[in-house]
């Protein structure tokens, strides 16, 4: 029993090292607050550890982690709409991290992303993380056949809001804005 717990714990730690930063960047896009994103990551990997302990399937760990993170973020956002969170006064004095943005495109992209509906943010963030349409469908709780159409609409709305051309820059900016120092 003790040996299997160590093996399970090490497997969870290995997956955290492999996917933790990407899950965090994804969570920041969805919950829009770094502390909440950290909570989503912690909740996701705790569930993953329990999943491993229960002998759960590990054939698509990355997809599983992003699906659980999406659900945790959605649950957190629902709770947030019911309760106004208390933030200590010193939180308001800490400025958000500043990323290099010489021509304002990054700020424009970030602002446009924040204004999008939750499902659009979710779809864009999942795609930016490289998940398959099947995994995106599972995480977003939509039919796999609908992913392409809904994702295209989300990209169109985001690009219309930012004025960014459809030449791949959109996804690059989405990934760059997600976490300071990422890429």
Regions found by a protein language model. Give the residues of each.
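Short amphipathic alpha helix immediately N-terminal
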Residues: 116-135
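A short, charge-rich alpha-helical start-of-domain segment used by transcription regulators
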Residues: 1-25, 35-38, 49
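Internal acidic/polar
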Residues: 83-106, 132, 173-179
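Arg/Lys-rich amphipathic alpha helix in sigma70-family domain 2
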Residues: 53-56, 67-88, 102
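Structural recognition of an alpha-helix C-terminal capping motif at a helix-to-coil junction
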Residues: 25, 39-46, 50, 59-71
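C-terminal flanking helix
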Residues: 20, 24, 45, 117, ...
């Amino acid at each position: 029993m003790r040996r299997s717990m160590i093996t399970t714990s090490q497997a969870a730690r290995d997956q955290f090292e492999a996917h933790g930063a990407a899950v965090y960047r994804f969570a920041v896009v969805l919950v829009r607050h770094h502390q909440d994103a950290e909570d989503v990551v912690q909740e996701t990997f705790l569930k993953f550890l329990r999943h491993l302990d229960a002998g759960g399937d590990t054939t698509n760990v990355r997809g599983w982690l992003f699906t659980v993170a999406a659900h945790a973020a959605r649950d957190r956002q629902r709770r947030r709409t019911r309760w106004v969170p208390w933030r200590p006064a010193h939180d308001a004095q800490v400025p958000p991290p500043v990323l290099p943005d010489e021509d304002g495109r990054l700020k424009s992209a970030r602002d446009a992303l924040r204004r999008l509906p939750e499902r659009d943010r979710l779809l864009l963030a999942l795609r930016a993380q490289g998940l398959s349409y099947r995994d995106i469908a599972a995480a977003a709780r939509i039919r796999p056949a609908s992913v392409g159409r809904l994702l295209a609409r989300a990209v169109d709305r985001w690009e219309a809001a930012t004025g960014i051309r459809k030449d791949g820059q959109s996804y690059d900016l989405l990934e760059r804005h997600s976490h300071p120092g990422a890429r």
